[in-house]
């Protein structure tokens, strides 16, 4: 089960999170690029690149927003966690209505999604100096400085 969680569920949760940033950045007219994983790039699919250690993390980079306002940047930074939360609620609803089985896989998916929400909204910079979503929100509200790329 560990391998399923680490090599399948966690990358899917990461993809959902990054897709939230991507969708909202596109809604504001931004050009985007996003990545799943770290290390050497394996391949690209449009703006998505998959890296060697695809199960480790993800990031999103955007520029040229049509609406280059503080609220637009905050919306983009919050969108990853919002997508994770929407999926948590959807999965729980589908389990409660017996559409999905009460499976450990779905519980792990919800767990990893909560993990992503918690740590992405906590304000910090990682070892590479990239800001968490929470730090990016803090910086854009306090200093008017949009961060790029974001985790």
Q: Model features per residue range: what roles?
A:
Residues 59-81:
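Individual transmembrane alpha-helix segments
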Residues 31-32, 118-143:
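Juxtamembrane/interfacial segments flanking transmembrane helices
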Residues 1-24, 81-105:
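Long, highly hydrophobic alpha-helical transmembrane signal-anchor segments
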Residues 26-30, 96-100, 124-128:
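Transmembrane helix-loop junctions in multipass membrane proteins, especially transporters and channels
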Residues 5-64:
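Small-residue-rich helix-interface/hinge motifs
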Residues 10-14, 112-120:
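Alpha-helical transmembrane segments of multi-pass membrane proteins
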Residues 104-114:
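Loop-to-helix entry and N-terminal half of a specific, functionally important transmembrane alpha helix
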Residues 44-45, 141-151:
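Cytosolic juxtamembrane regulatory segments of multi-pass membrane proteins
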């Amino acid at each position: 089960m560990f391998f399923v969680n680490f090599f399948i569920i966690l990358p899917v949760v990461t993809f959902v999170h990054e897709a939230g940033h991507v969708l909202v950045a596109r809604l504001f007219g931004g050009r985007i690029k996003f990545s799943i994983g770290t290390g050497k790039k394996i391949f690209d699919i449009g703006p998505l690149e998959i890296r060697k250690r695809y199960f480790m993390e993800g990031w999103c980079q955007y520029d040229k927003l049509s609406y280059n306002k503080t609220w637009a940047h905050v919306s983009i930074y919050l969108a990853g966690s919002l997508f994770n939360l929407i999926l948590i609620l959807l999965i729980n609803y589908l389990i409660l209505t017996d559409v999905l089985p009460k499976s450990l896989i779905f519980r792990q998916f919800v767990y990893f999604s909560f993990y992503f929400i918690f740590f992405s909204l906590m304000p910090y910079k990682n070892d590479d100096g990239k800001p968490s979503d929470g730090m990016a929100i803090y910086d854009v509200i306090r200093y008017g400085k949009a961060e790029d790329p974001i985790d």
